[in-house]
Amino acid sequence: MNVDYPMNNIPQASSLLRKNNGKRLSMASAARTSLLGNLNLNGTSGGASGRNSNIIDSSSLSMGNTGKRRSLLSTPASINRRRQSSLLQAPMSSSQMSSQSQQASQQTQAPFNQDQRPLRDKNYQTLIQQEIYDFLLANKFELEMNHPLTFKTLKQPTQKDFVVIFQFLYNKIDPYYRFTKSIETEVFLLLKILNYPYLDGINRSQISAVGGQNWPNFLGMLYWLVKLNLSVLNLNSKVDLISPDDEFDKIFINYITQSYRAFIDERDDYSEYYDEMKSRFDELNNNIIQDIENISNENNELLNQYNELNGQLDILENSEKKSKALENDLIKFKAYIETMESRKSKWSEILNKITQEIGNCEVELNNIESVKRDYEAQIGQQGLTPNDIDNLNTERDKLSKSIDLISNSLEDLKDVYHNKQINLQKNYQSLENFLKQYNNLIYKIQLKNHNYDYNFEINFRNNTIINETPDLLKPNEIINKNLKDEKIQLLNYKSIINTNVHMHQDEQIKLQEQIDLISELIMERREEIETLEAKLTANKSTYDEIYETMINDTTTYSMQIEKLERELRSIKINTNQGFIEVENKFQNIQIEYDELLYEIHSNRSILHDKIQKIIESTIGFKINIQSNLEDLENLAFDEFEKEDKKLNKN
């Protein structure tokens, strides 16, 4: 069941849902449940905290059974929380102290909840002031508190106005609470109990002077209390809690409330309420089944009607499609007839134009034939025939073709010569680069070994030899050394290097044998260490067993001690009433301690956040540098591959 509440930040305390019937709400009942809660916390079984709570001495529960409880703050959970370290309770065990310290650390390490409401906005202040003013008037603030109220009171309040309004709003939530301490302590403590989400923006010094710049924060707090009151009123109404469509939940909640009231009245027989709930369930179930049958019958009838209408709809759609097709054909025929009619009027003009063009063409043909006869007469006078003219034209075409072939072959030869020259230049350049690499390698090798005195460097005899001599050159004419002699010298030098390598390998084998001996000694030492560790683990297991038995004995003894202390505490509750004042002082000191601890943890969390931001920025800077270095490395590697490919091609 989904229930929509008006405010998400308002605490929905289960104790607020109780009916004030005046029964089983005394201080004695609260003390009894708190004692039982302590029994459960100290390790006893949970079954002892139910209806078996009557095992406690009836004399300790006789005080105030008929009176009402003083406040919602006197509920068992609150008594157990507010009197954790009082003199009326036994000292806490180690498990209790650890659990409470964890709860305190969780509470103090809660993040700072910043108020997002525009409390400094004048329009927003006017709106919430109007709502607070309307709520106070509707709930008869002036009659109950005997204090005047105007709209100006919420704009420029005095300290007394704030105190009276706060007391009125809180008493609407908890009618039995009485304000006995100073207003600074009361306001801060009550807001902390109500889980006010923006308590971090309020401190004790501001509570003593609410006017001026501090008033918007306190106005927002009063508005939150008004909304909390409205939500409590909505919780008391059944209509808001249960949706109108969910009758089963209404019946079940009615059964729960009646059973709970019987439990409050100390009656254990719930059969009457159960039978009533069962009969109402059966009646409602039968009604729902009947409604389902009626709806199914109506659904079948509607389905039949739908099928009939669907068949008629298919016939109608087919007829509409046919009519649309006929309309389209009619439109096309009309368009075709119109085009043919328009062409009829144009055919006469077209025929006249064609006849005129035929006459013009015949005149031009006669003119061309007369010109042809004139040309033939002129050629006959020169002594040439048309065949002679054709032969001359064919010879001219042959000569032009032969000239073109010769010019093309000349261009091809030029291209071949140019390509050969380019290849020769490239080969010369590659040879020059190869000699440079060879000289560099020889230089590096000779730096490492000075025993062999021979200059292996090879150079060209003349750098301009290719440009000056077009004839073919032998290898010895290009470089300054004989390659065969140079090869012999290189082989001799290689043999010297191989002998040195073998000497170093022998030395390496000797060193490896020494390393193997040392590693064997290390393995023996490790085996000894493993045996000692096995003995240590065995000793640890025996120690753990002894330690567990000792802890079990101590827990049993501590449980017996706690049981005796609880008995002693129950006696002190009835005899030592004078310790209550000391308890109240201790509670005040404890509250101040919690506040100081909360401030320390909040400052610590702020420092942790700052350190985390610094670390994140440092990591981001480092990652950026690494990515840039990787990009630079990839770029250098690509350039190296390109150069290597060029050298391999050459």
Swiss-Prot record:
Claim: Cell division is one of the keywords in the record: yes
Gene Ontology BP terms: cell division; mitotic sister chromatid biorientation
GO molecular function, one term: microtubule binding
Disulfide bonds: none
InterPro entries: DUF5595, Kinetochore_Ndc80, Ndc80_CH, Ndc80_sf
GO cellular component, one term: nucleus
Coiled-coil regions listed: 265-443, 510-601
Record has Amino-acid biosynthesis as a keyword: no
Disordered: region residues: 43-119
UniProtKB keywords: Cell cycle, Cell division, Centromere, Chromosome, Coiled coil, Kinetochore, Mitosis, Nucleus
Origin: domain of life: Eukaryota
Locations listed in the record: Nucleus; Chromosome, Centromere, Kinetochore
A Pfam family it matches: DUF5595
Main location: nucleus
Compositionally skewed regions (Low complexity) per UniProt: 85-111
Compositional bias segments (type: Polar residues): 50-65
Family indicated by similarity: Belongs to the NDC80/HEC1 family.
Subunit structure as annotated in this protein's UniProt entry: Component of the NDC80 complex, which consists of NDC80, NUF2, SPC24 and SPC25.
Function per UniProt: Acts as a component of the essential kinetochore-associated NDC80 complex, which is required for chromosome segregation and spindle checkpoint activity.
Name of this protein: Probable kinetochore protein NDC80
Gene: NDC80
